[in-house]
Amino acid sequence: MNILWDFDGTLFDTYKAFTNVLHEVLKGSVPPDEIFLELKKSFTHATAFFQLSEDQIAEFKLKERAISPEKKRPFPFVEDVLKQSNLNVIMTHKPREEVQTILDYFGWNHYFQEIVAGDDGFPRKPDPTAYRYLHDKYKLDLAVGDRVLDIVPAKEIGLHTCLFQNEAEGADFYLDTYEDFYKTIKI
């Protein structure tokens, strides 16, 4: 199976760290559970929802980049899926350097044929341009993400879709743990 992966919240459990940083930036004025829910929609959505100033956005980005990869661990059993798939690619809004830092830390670079990162010049999701580029090059079968934003472009170009730890409508498959990947995903 040839798989396109989102990065944050799909391969790596980064949202806890993001939530803690935004909670700090907001001076504890918003409960972490509420921050998490808004961040899961998108960072852009969360910044508008919480009316972050440019200074607060800059503070968030600075603090988030300073978090050790140790605090951004891969989800359990996802490495088993990476090992068993034919090919893996990443499409993320995260800057390439940040992706590489985390992949280097865990020794995971060899699992990915290509990474399209946020600073590569492609339009942001849900625009399908980056997905189409990767699909044309690698003949993908499945896109896995944790947000509807991750599956909309995949659907548009005809890929099967899987939402991870998200039960929103629209995906072909749903997973709460990667331990169930091959029991659940039938393509």
Residue spans for each PLM region:
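Short, acidic loop-to-helix structural element flanking the phosphoryl-transfer center
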Residues: 66-90, 96-100, 128
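N-terminal helical cap/lid subdomain that shapes the substrate entry/recognition surface
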Residues: 1-76
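A mid-sequence interfacial segment
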Residues: 45-47, 89-109
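Conserved SAM-binding loop
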Residues: 4, 11, 88-91, 143-144
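Ser/Thr-centric signal marking residues that sit
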Residues: 10, 14, 92, 161
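Conserved Rossmann-like nucleotide-cofactor binding loop
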Residues: 10, 17, 96, 149, ...
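Asp-based, Mg2+/Mn2+-dependent phosphohydrolase catalytic module
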Residues: 1, 100-187
